[in-house]
Amino acid sequence: MNKVKSISLMFPLYKDRSTVKLMSKKSVKVLKKLKKKYEIIIVDDGCPQNSGKLAKEISKKYSNVKVFFHKKNLGYGAALKTGFKKFKNDWIFMIDGDNEYDVNDLFRLVKASENYDLVITYRYKKKYTTSRILISWIYNAILRLIFNLKFRDISTGSRFVSRKLVKRIKLRSNSPFVGAELAIKAELAGYKVSEIGIHTYPRTFGTGSSVSFKNILLTLKDMFLLFSRI
């Protein structure tokens, strides 16, 4: 039985200046309610909006907030891998910094982690544009086909993973494929993976970059590189 004693909450920043303060405040509130040892890790992935500078100011207000910087934009996967190198606690909650996901889902993720090493999420209803829903559907269909997966949705930005798993699996992807890579390698290595349903919310500030043409190409590249290695 897994007992969650301490949690590291991590989110990357890229063009998320408008939400970093809100995400930090929500995260602190939820983690305090859980009454467990915690830290918040923010990784500025070369953000052009000085989001990291704002995050640094937030870290002065909250001692449990730690901020790390990339000098240039290295990619979503690279930002998460930096967080994986820096976190200190037993479990890590990965969530995007754009406020599309609800930090309160952490309560359910902690509960769902009993007897599992990784808990991924699927979206009950995707409140996105038709094109983004179509891209997500095609992406998940390809993943299920070539990797023989049974997960409903492997492309969400909300996951809860044990330190044991993170430290034993080497992740290579710098693209948004990193989340799928984590789940695929966890299954192949014999770790127990569960999934729960969550609600997502429309982005209220800025525009996301995960479904940009560049990121789609990089994701496909990382996907087929992994497929060629297994």
Feature roles, as predicted:
Residues 68-86, 91, 103-176, 201-221, ...:
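Acceptor/aglycone-binding surface of glycosyltransferases and processive sugar-polymer synthases
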Residues 16-31:
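Short, well-formed alpha-helical segments that are part of the catalytic scaffolds
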Residues 6-8, 39, 181:
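Cell-envelope/extracellular polymer assembly enzymes that use nucleotide-activated donors
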